[in-house]
């Protein structure tokens, strides 16, 4: 059975049902946000941080194209588009010092310590690495948020932005599925948001099993998993059902 929104019949909105795993989910697109996580050169482009740190980014191009498709469909349906950029100030004060676990676990920070010539080039605000990939350009009405840690809810205004608009459903795309996407969706789950991941609009950091494990965790414990074609079909005008 489709899992409905807790307020599915309260606003007379246009509802749509998205086929997903482990079951379909029903939501109002105009009370839903599409979240694009960290589609920066750092994560999706050769020569960016992930590539320099030894992660494979050779298969990110189809993900970029799928995100373009999902963003277009979401914008047409009246969904809010939120873009995240992960990183810190040029001096990396926001990254935390040795007293922060981020200092010790961030592969970007470790890569720069191991290769001093990269200092100031990885995930620094204003750098090429920090910029969104050329193919993905926010439009007027979209929201672009910086974030200093893996979760988009930590030390950002995301929660208040969503609650002020009555948004309870979040559709996730981006990189990396097993790090920032999953971290943000998990935090959203704890804050009572319904999270859906479009699996072919995401990409893992690490081996393919990391993608599979993240999607298993999400569909089993924290949310729902679908794909871009199914999402676009659900948002087409013929899929809407008027809630009286």
Swiss-Prot record:
Source superkingdom: Bacteria
Transmembrane is among the record's keywords: no
UniProt cross-references to InterPro entries, sorted A to Z: Isochorismatase-like_dom, Isochorismatase-like_hydrls, Isochorismatase-like_sf, RutB
E.C. numbers: 3.5.1.110
Any one Gene Ontology BP term: uracil catabolic process
Keyword Lipid metabolism: no
Keywords for the protein's UniProt record, in alphabetical order: Hydrolase
GO molecular function: hydrolase activity, acting on carbon-nitrogen (but not peptide) bonds, in linear amides
Full protein name: Ureidoacrylate amidohydrolase RutB
Species name: Escherichia coli O1:K1 / APEC
Designated gene of the protein: rutB
């Amino acid at each position: 059975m489709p899992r409905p929104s807790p307020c599915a019949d309260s606003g007379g909105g246009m509802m749509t049902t998205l086929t997903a795993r482990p079951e379909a989910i029903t939501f109002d697109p105009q009370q839903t946000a599409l979240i694009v996580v960290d589609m920066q050169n750092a994560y999706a482009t050769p020569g960016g941080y992930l590539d320099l740190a030894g992660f494979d980014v050779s298969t990110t191009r189809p993900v970029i194209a799928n995100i373009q498709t999902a963003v277009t469909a979401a914008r047409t349906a009246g969904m809010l588009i939120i873009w995240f950029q992960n990183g810190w100030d040029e001096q990396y004060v926001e990254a935390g010092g040795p007293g922060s676990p981020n200092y010790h676990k961030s592969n970007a920070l470790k890569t720069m310590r191991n290769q001093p010539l990269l200092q100031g080039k990885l995930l620094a605000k204003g750098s090429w690495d920090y910029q969104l990939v050329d193919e993905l350009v926010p439009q007027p009405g979209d929201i672009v948020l910086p974030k200093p840690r893996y979760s988009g809810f930590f030390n950002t205004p995301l929660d208040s932005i969503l609650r002020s608009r009555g948004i309870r459903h979040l559709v996730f795309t981006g990189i990396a599925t097993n790090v920032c996407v999953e971290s943000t969706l998990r935090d959203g789950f704890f804050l009572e948001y319904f999270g859906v991941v479009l699996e072919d609009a995401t990409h893992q950091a690490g081996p393919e099993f990391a993608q599979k494990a993240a999607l298993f965790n999400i569909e089993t414990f924290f949310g729902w998993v679908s794909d871009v074609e199914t999402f676009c079909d659900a948002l087409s005008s013929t899929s809407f059902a008027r809630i009286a």
